[in-house]
């Protein structure tokens, strides 16, 4: 939980461009996870 708070602190102090980059990375991870977890669907 402390790591999460630290991440949020860094996130809140980071510039807007960095926030967008982190959000896009997070979205990519979320979008790629189901495809990797269920290869039998394809």
Curated annotation (Swiss-Prot):
InterPro entries: MntS. It comes from the Bacteria. Induction: Repressed by MntR in response to manganese. One of its GO terms (cellular component) is cytoplasm. Keywords: Cytoplasm. It is found in: Cytoplasm. Required for repression of mntH by MntR. May function as a chaperone that makes manganese more available by delivering it to the necessary cellular locations when manganese is limiting. This is Small protein MntS. It comes from Escherichia coli (strain K12). The gene is mntS.
């Amino acid at each position: 939980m402390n790591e999460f708070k630290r991440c949020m602190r860094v996130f809140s102090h980071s510039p807007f461009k960095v926030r967008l980059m982190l959000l896009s990375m997070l979205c990519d991870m979320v979008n790629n996870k189901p495809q990797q977890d269920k290869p039998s669907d394809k």
